[in-house]
Amino acid sequence: MQPATLYLDNAASTRPADEVLEAMADAATRWFGNPSSAHSHGAGATRALEEARAAVMKALGTDVGQLIFTSGGTEANALGVLGAAALARGRHLITSAIEHAAVLRNAEKLATERAFELSTVLPEPATGVVAAEAIASRLRRDTAVVALMLVNNELGTVQPVAEVARALDAFAAREGIRRPHLHVDAVQAFGLLPVRAGTLGADSIALSAHKLHGPKGVGALWLRPGARVAALWDGGRQERGLRSGTENVPAIVGFGQAARLASAALRAGTPDRIAALRDALEAGILAAVPGARPTVTGGARAAHIASLAFPRLPAEPLLHALEARGVFVSAGSACASKTSGPSHVLKAVGVDDHTAVLRFSLSRQSTAEDVDAAVAALAGAVGELSE
């Protein structure tokens, strides 16, 4: 008999909400026209598109700037980083060692293909937080782009984006130059904690629908008024000329609906409930598994991610033992779990090759019963591997 399934890998992807699937099905049947078409079918698709755009911007707490729909968070990050760099005079980019590969690999692309110089800032190993002062100390007159994520997808740590924005403002005022473009990867934050474009101080913000019970294959890049990026490719020049290609209206409608639902959950205090579940999960695991410890401590964290280290235990067998008990989690992150050894993020906070790190990530659908079941399953899995 198969065990009941307990999905605790929501930082990798979430189950689409029923309301999202219904909205997408409706859009697919009603608004199948091309938004660029001049007839009524095109006009209907355009209305659906713009209503979704307004919903996502409202969830960002803004009605100014531009929101460009993309194929997901990876493309949104690429547009923010590469697009800003393409228009910059400087050839210096600052980022952190714990960014998602969608940012780090595009930064490396700028170094190899456009002779950019990269400054990569390490986090504090104990907290997993990148100090704003460490970024500020690397600013130069030729700094073109600063890229910093809001919530780390493996550790759950919240990075000091607003503080970095203030440091950029102060540097630009002191030097009498244009402020470097600040790009923020908010994929693991949007819809999960309050993200307000006006208070972050970012020039561009990357978002993704499937992290907040929306569909895969759709994301967005928000640009503050006056911020400019170059398109990654050309064509029909949809999305304000910045993202050519016929828009995926059903997916975008689903994104808009997911943003509405996430906003309602935030207003209802859902992050506090999820944080309480996370704390109970961590406490239960630490009590049940000798030697287990939090991967990082002391820094601000998003409510939904618990990252725990298990010295002298192998990550992959532990994952498989949990799956055999019906519990699905990630080793570090889904992006790194198919590689050997710790991810670049875990290495940056000092995790060695002999320590397993599991990421348990909750959602607004998680319950106290889920927590109890996860703790019991993990205790059984560790006991099995320790025999």
Residue ranges of model-derived segments:
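Pyridoxal 5′-phosphate
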Residues: 1-387
